[in-house]
Amino acid sequence: MRTRLQSPITLLLVLGLVLAACASSSPSPSAGASSGASAGPSGAAADLHGQTVTVIGTWTDTEETAFRAMVKPWETQTGATVKYQGTRAINDILAAGIPTGVLPDLAGLPGPAQMQEYVTAGALKPLDGVLDVATYTSETASGLTDLGKVNGKTYGVFIKGAVKGLIWYSPTLHDYSSAPPATWDDLVRQLKANQGNAKALWCLGIESGAASGWPATDWIENILVRQAGPQVYNDWWAGKVKWTDPAIKAAFTTYMNDVVANTFGGGTTAVATAFANGGDPLFKSPPGCAAFQQASFITGLGAFKDKKAGTDYNAFPFPSFNSQYATAVEGAGDLFGMFHDTAAAKSLIAYLVTAPAQDIWVKIGGALSANKNAADYPDAISKTMGGMLANAGILVFDASDQMPTDMNAAFWSHMVSLTSGKETIDAALTALQKIADTAYKK
């Protein structure tokens, strides 16, 4: 997911990045692919003492702690230092840095669409000579590797993954673990039958600061790919299917009629509730809702704090609408790219795609590995999710993250207006198509 902050905050963050870049080590001698690939826990590390790699990503708080734990073995073995800055203003910082050249060595990229923009601008460095691309491709979840390519060259690699559209619930209300609902109609029927004293069928929180609305876009995406299939889904985010198309309207209608209309507190509560706290009413007495839809990474953001996986909470995959697309999974991930090809930067990014590196974050929790060989999951739920990502029959990537920046921002904004009841479906789709008419031409 991508976020934007107001300009005064952004300027301060950009200033911090400038200082970080100035404080980094002087350009080091170029290193070949072997020095990067060997700099990991399981191989002989290159000697990079005194060198610094500047990195920015969206991770703060517990996620930042996990990332720092992930890079610690590399720092210990190479002698280099990772200077990390966590911010939700990735878009703004990189957009400001492209023209000036004031950029970090490595960065978590906002999404595949922005990665292509950075490549076109000549800012991102290709990774084909930095890591063994064949090995990376064979070890990475199918469907992700091509998202990091532009004109056949690899510019972005995934160091962490996520499954979106999981249905979270409390087994104390009803345990779905032995036979989760397979279809949407079955899900709605079972939620109603097992609702008990819960006040509503669904919990929903879509507030996320300047990025408010993105959790609602996930609802649309998960519904659409299962109703209309991956071809329509991919053509839609690419601007080839109009927002006013009947298939798109059907997904929006399902969201409004089946979800928002049956949400705890209604749409006005949903737009005011932080997404990480959206599922909190599951555990109230009486429960506020019977189910909550969110991605696998929600457990790493403080959701279900002090709750035990499998006992206090559980999850199952988003059910199907059309049996033809029953194996569809919406995935997401953290795409990393390199702006400065120093020896230390090349070594670090080659390390980050390995299973030993990704196992560190996986074991901490709240993350799925993009590497299929990582398996150190902390609980059965996380392990199942990891298998979903690695073995999906139909894997599509988060649609909004692949849209042009203006389109993505408008999608978020109109989902807030729609959910809160300030806008009708037809009005929202017409407005979004008007933006699409220009956004895809830039």
What are these regions (language model features)?
Residues 22-116, 121, 133-136, 344, ...:
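Conserved N-terminal structural module of periplasmic/extracytoplasmic solute-binding proteins
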Residues 40-47, 112-165, 215:
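Hinge/lid segment of periplasmic solute-binding proteins
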Residues 47, 128-140, 179, 206-210, ...:
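Short, solvent-exposed loop/beta-turn-alpha elements that line the ligand-binding surface or hinge
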Residues 52, 389-442:
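Conserved C-terminal helix/tail region of periplasmic/extracytoplasmic solute-binding proteins
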Residues 72, 287, 304-367:
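Extracytoplasmic/periplasmic substrate-recognition and gating elements
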Residues 96-97, 104-105, 136-171, 325-329, ...:
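A structural signal for short loop-to-beta-strand junctions that line the ligand-binding cleft
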Residues 155-159, 188-241:
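Extracytoplasmic/periplasmic solute-binding protein
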Residues 237-272:
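Glycine-centered hinge/linker elements that transmit conformational signals in sensory
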